[in-house]
Amino acid sequence: MPLGSKVFQYQTELEWVGGRECRVGAPGRPDLTVTPPEDFPGANAMHWSPEHLFTASLQSCTMLSFLAHCAHNGVEVVSYQSEAAGELARREDDRRYAFRRVAMIVTATVAGGHAHLAQGLTAKAERDCFISASTTATVETAWRISE
């Protein structure tokens, strides 16, 4: 590891509560109930699934990265929304299921006169999202930036 490189650690806890349901949490944060998605036995559409959490983690990490780059460059973000769809499929090489693609559509509004600069920061936001950097899935993001 290079000298001066930061290392971050994140601790979580999981407790099985029966069937195919568990509670996950982290110190000082509310618990989430997690079940399989509707495609699998034991699903409960009222709860998050690991697959939905993975997709949402890419969305939220991309947003936080974009907001950080905008803040560092004096761009005021007025609004930000995104939609994402994750594609889980069997891989050809090892026949295991994995996310192979996540497609996101981001719609953001920035303060007047900064749309061009904000558009230029989108590639940095994608590059610097820690979750994107940690997956082998292709992450495709379509940005709609307006003033």
Describe these PLM feature segments.
Residues C61-T62:
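Alpha-helical metal-binding/catalytic segments enriched in His/Glu/Asp
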Residues M1-A56, L67-E147:
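Extended beta-strand/beta-hairpin segments
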